[in-house]
From Swiss-Prot:
Residues 744-757 have a biased composition (Basic and acidic residues). Its EC number is 3.1.13.1. Belongs to the RNR ribonuclease family. RNase R subfamily. Its main location: cytoplasm. Residues 268-594 form the RNB domain. The lineage of its organism: Bacteria, Pseudomonadati, Pseudomonadota, Gammaproteobacteria, Pasteurellales. 3'-5' exoribonuclease that releases 5'-nucleoside monophosphates and is involved in maturation of structured RNAs. SUPFAM superfamilies: Nucleic acid-binding proteins. GO terms for molecular function: exoribonuclease II activity; RNA binding. This is Ribonuclease R.
């Protein structure tokens, strides 16, 4: 190696990483991109090799493979002139295709706020979920930024769930996911015993260049109809959620015993005599956190013990790869798909009562005013003194004599825990954290697996105590990593965008409300608004709209703070059994603890690891994706179950609130049931209706009739579309009568039409007038 070559390699900021992976390293992808960017023009392969002083045959071959891989991943574009160019220099985008049931689609591009529109004819070249390279194609007639597909970089959708049909001797599968806009052709030799109408899984075959007709092989027959549990099986496959542990993982976990070995307990702080207890819901099966609190001076000392999952799940082991790919456990209404095998999630890693367990401990000191004044982390062994439930603890705090007698030794500690909670709650309000009181629901199933009733979930003080204790441990963990400049996955929550802020303020103005803070409202401003409206009958609606105005919390290597919690740093530490980000944080903390004791290695004997920032950056994107994937899948199942429930109520009348207003109708959320349905614009009164997006309302052009977000209404259930997971309603009355025709109403309507975009006049032509609507009116949905 020449001196010039050595010096150039040393300029690569990722050289050490490459050296750890390869004995004879080549420049990193990042450095190759920098070289091409600095050249200010596309480069052929020889020019790149010369610029990087690469002459060794093995390294030339390695570079050829790396450049091809970078091309496949969309980092580089190989032009017709056989040169490598940067996509952004060619004005190209990399992104994920999101299909729409109407046949068009959108391109989600990392780092871009708005999605790009993919017209129907371009969607014929791709499929929902594809990772593609696309080129801007101007604006469509509605002013949306349109793209043209250049190349499919990765076909991510390998398997599709749907119903199998036969027609004129041809077999095909109609996808259950409406975002997949085309049927899948199944040749006779690939039906594998599937019969007409069965729910099947079809595996897509290699696509042709034109991709005119997707072809597949039936690999699994799920059943003849929607049997019990079928909705979960479909959602798992629709969202590509891993739900069966590979044989290699099953083999790997066989080495674990039911009890913690004495060898594993060595060198740990012994907390077995400390009366730590778990407090969870009645139906909880895995217990990954335990708490104990005692008075300390004028304040308190709090121990939060978390299952030491990282001791068993070692980095890059077969088990770790599977946990990483899953990202998190998925909680369906009637089934759990765990991140870890049961021997760990319900066994060795679960802090079950009266058994020794390994744990990571965050021991904290809190002032009388609820401020975290000191903390320390360490590895320990514990023995849970009791498995308590939220209901039991709440009753004990309320004075239940029978329970207080049964758990007499624990009651004093629980009372201190409650006093601590009150101080933490006061400190939370003092810093201005947004305190949402969202209504969650629980499905009660009958023996057939169908919903018998839907109940709201009540969060008592015991549940809130644990939430505050966990949040404090998360704060301490994030602070520990930030203080030591150790790469970590932070739970970040960005400030609201200007667009969403403006929209929310317009909504508030309709209710005579304001959000203080000018262009940059603080968390305290939002909290003050919620406090102001909490006694109003429409407070749930206002809170929902406030939630929509905020950004989504995600995992990220860059710590920008958590807006909603009003915190400078926050991370997830307390649930490593069910969340991979927590597992990575445990590894980082263990590494720092070992480093403080003089250790020099990146790994520790108990499962610690020093991640690089780049590794964390990739993990942040991945874990945020798996979290969204789980949310989408559970929402899909809940929607299906709600529709199934509503099938027994077609023709029934219910009260509800308008929860969303669109150009094609109103969505109404039913009181008590919390089920949403659509009142299509074609079913409204005999008038032309215009959508006022700014003020979230539909306005009758002639009558002045208005339907507004938050209006209380009475509806009739008209139809249930189980295949689309949608319910149709019709309006039969409104508790707050909409403003009807009259001089004032008409003038207001005219004023609104003048304020609407000019293209509104074009829409008016297609607005639906009841007397002109036949039974064949298509029900346009978004």
């Amino acid at each position: 190696m020449t001196k010039k070559r050595k010096n150039l390699i040393n300029q690569d900021p990722h050289y050490k990483r490459e050296l750890e992976k390869y004995g004879n390293p080549i420049p990193s992808r990042e450095f190759i991109l920098t070289v091409i960017r600095d050249n200010n023009a596309p480069m052929n392969r020889d020019e790149i090799l010369t610029a990087l002083s690469i002459r060794n045959e093995d390294q030339i071959e390695a570079m050829r493979r790396r450049l091809r891989a970078m091309e496949n991943d969309g980092q580089l574009v190989f032009t017709k002139r056989k040169r490598y160019a940067l996509p952004e220099k060619l004005d190209l985008f990399k992104g994920t295709v999101i299909g729409h049931r109407e046949g068009f689609g959108f391109l989600q591009v990392d780092g871009k706020k708005d999605d790009l529109f993919i017209p129907n004819h371009q969607m014929q070249r791709v499929m929902h979920g594809d990772f593609v390279l696309a080129q801007p194609a101007g604006l469509d007639r509605r002013g949306r930024r349109e793209v043209r597909i250049v190349r499919v970089l990765e076909s991510r959708k390998k398997q599709i769930v749907g119903r199998f049909f036969l027609e004129n001797g041809f077999g095909y599968v109609v996808p259950d996911d409406s975002r997949i806009g085309r049927d899948i052709l199944v040749p006779n030799e690939h039906r594998n015993g599937a019969r007409m109408g069965q729910v099947v899984v079809v595996e897509l075959q290699e696509r042709s260049a034109s991709f005119n007709q997707p072809i597949g092989v039936i690999t699994e027959i799920l059943g003849d109809n929607m049997a019990k549990g079928m909705e979960v099986e479909i959602a798992l496959r629709n969202h590509d959620i891993l739900h069966k542990f590979p044989s290699a993982v099953e083999k790997y976990v066989k080495k674990f015993t039911e009890e913690v070995s004495e060898e594993a307990k060595k060198g740990r702080v012994d907390l077995r005599n400390l009366p730590l207890v778990t407090i969870d819901g009645e139906d909880a099966r895995d217990f990954d956190d335990a708490v104990y609190c005692e008075k300390h001076g004028k304040g308190w000392k709090l121990w939060v013990a978390i299952a030491d999952v990282s001791y068993y799940v070692r980095l890059r082991s077969t088990l770790d790869v599977e946990a990483h790919n899953r990202g998190n456990s998925v909680y369906f209404p009637n089934r759990v798909v765990p991140m870890l095998p049961e021997i760990l999630s319900n066994g060795l890693c679960s802090l079950n009562p009266q058994v020794d367990r390994l744990c990571m401990v965050c021991e904290m000191q809190i002032s009388a005013k609820g401020k975290l004044t000191d903390y320390r982390f360490y590895e320990a062994v514990m023995n849970s003194h009791a498995r308590l439930t939220y209901t039991k603890v709440a009753k004990m705090l309320e004075g239940d004599e029978e329970l207080r007698t049964r758990y007499s030794t624990l009651v004093p500690h629980l009372e201190e825990l409650y006093k601590l909670y009150q101080a933490l709650l006061s400190a939370r309000h003092q810093r201005g954290a947004i305190d949402f009181e969202t209504i969650e629901t629980k499905f009660i199933f009958n023996a057939m697996g169908r919903i018998e009733r839907i109940e709201p979930v009540v969060r008592n003080d015991a549940x809130k105590i644990i939430e505050e204790c966990m949040x404090l441990a998360n704060i301490a963990a994030a602070n520990f990593m930030e203080k030591h400049k150790e790469p970590a996955l932070y739970r970040i929550h960005a400030t609201p965008s200007e667009e969403k802020l403006t929209s929310f303020r317009t909504f508030l103005s309709e209710f005579g409300l304001t959000l203080e803070g000018g262009l940059k409202p603080t968390t305290k401003d939002y909290a003050a608004l919620l406090e102001k409206v909490k006694e109003r009958p429409d407070h749930e609606l206002i809170q929902t709209m406030l939630l929509r105005s905020l950004s989504q919390a995600v995992y990220h290597a860059d710590n920008i703070g958590h807006f909603g919690l009003a915190l400078e740093e926050y991370a997830h530490f307390t649930s490593p059994i069910r969340r991979y980000p927590d597992l990575t944080l445990h590894r980082g903390i263990k590494y720092l603890l070992a480093k403080e004791q003089g250790a020099k290695r990146k790994t520790t004997d108990t499962g610690g690891y020093h991640y690089s920032f780049d590794e964390m950056d990739l993990l942040g994107n991945h874990c945020s994706m798996t979290e969204r994937r789980a949310d989408d899948a559970t929402r899909e199942v809940a929607d299906w179950l709600k529709c199934e429930y509503m099938q027994d109520h077609v023709g029934g009348e219910f009260s509800g609130v308008i929860s969303s207003v669109t150009g094609f109708g109103l969505f109404v959320r039913l009181d008590d049931l919390f089920i949403d349905g659509l009142v299509h614009i074609s079913t409204l009164e005999n008038d032309y209706y215009q959508f006022d997006a700014a003020k979230q309302r539909l306005i009758g052009e002639n009558s002045g009739m208005q339907y507004r977000l938050g209006d209380k209404v009475r509806i009739k259930v008209e139809a249930v579309h189980l295949e689309n997971k949608m319910v149709d309603f019709s309006l039969i009355g409104s508790e707050r009568k909409p403003r009807r025709a009259g001089k004032t109403a008409k003038e207001k309507a005219k004023k609104v039409f003048k304020e609407l975009p000019s293209k509104a006049s074009k829409k008016r032509k297609s607005a639906v007038k009841k007397k002109d609507v036949s039974k064949k009116t298509s029900r346009k949905r978004k």
